Amino acid sequence: MYEGIVQELIDELGRLPGIGPKSAQRIAFHILQTETFDVSRLAEVLTVVRDKVRFCAICGNVSEKETCGICRDPRRSPATICVVEEAKDVVAIERTREFRGLYHVLGGAISPIDGIGPDDLRIRQLMQRLADATVTEVIIATDPNLEGEATATYLSRLLSTFDIRVTRLASGLPVGGDLEYADEVTLGRAFEGRRLVGE
């Protein structure tokens, strides 16, 4: 334990996701000990981000405008919507340069343990978007964990009432991974999702 404001800094940094007590302490001391670290600039950027960044009115992605750049892009296909849990998932998919449709960010996943149900997610907004007959396919790209699977199952049932194609991202072995380290579920999915060689 440190005194006063130093401990407050460590505590506040530790509240960030993925930052444990040791990492928070390391970051705090980096800020304190590095002369070149511009604390004022960091504080300014944090304040500006909080004031300027919002969620896209259409898809829920982060944006500095009412709608995000992807939703405004006329080159994107409005026929396909990829449903993801968080805005960071949009960034991950965009890095592949494989998807040219639009997104819908749920804002999380169904997790009864955490008290998150379907009404806590942006599912109603997704249904409103599907009322427009332009959409022909919904790709469910939730995480391949219990919460993501629960969300995907819930969405699949809900979307079965629409005359659209509903697909789920394939999951299986990562490129460069070793079979011996793969868990049973991952291996099972890899077998289920196998395809003919040459496809």
UniProtKB/Swiss-Prot annotation:
UniProt record, GO biological process: DNA recombination; DNA repair
Entry-linked NCBIfam families: recR
UniProt zinc finger (C4-type) residues: 56-71
Domain of life from the UniProt record: Bacteria
Gene: recR
Source organism (scientific name): Clavibacter michiganensis subsp. michiganensis (strain NCPPB 382)
A molecular function (GO) term: zinc ion binding
HAMAP family: RecR
Name the UniProt record assigns to this protein: Recombination protein RecR
